[in-house]
């Protein structure tokens, strides 16, 4: 008997697949960082726009955005605060799942409150993309390039 048999075609293909999967897995932290930076930019710039022209922002929340249960001024303030604070957490990778989850819900509220205009302008597609990325970050976490990872290593049970 041959102690060192030649790998079959399936064995070689499986080996190549495992090699490729291992190489791609090394890109995961960069992909998650890219997602965090992209989403942070989108929401932070939106928050800056709200703050720069506050009277127009309140007018939009009065006339266009229909946020249930909140006055337009309160809704505008909470919206701006969310869009300016949560992206900072995402960039740092600090409380990332909380920040991504919060922005995920915020994104849904924006679509519901502004759906008619978004569908007319095609903007709903952007919100679907953002929601998908935020869902990935909420479920998968920020990746290894994050303050959360350092904190988990230091303070997680059994570390």
Language-model segments: residues:
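Extended, low-polarity transmembrane helix blocks
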Residues: 1-52, 69-81, 85, 92-159
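Residue-level detector of alpha-helical secondary structure
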Residues: 42-43, 56, 60
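Short juxtamembrane and helix-loop transition motifs at transmembrane-helix boundaries
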Residues: 58-68, 86-91
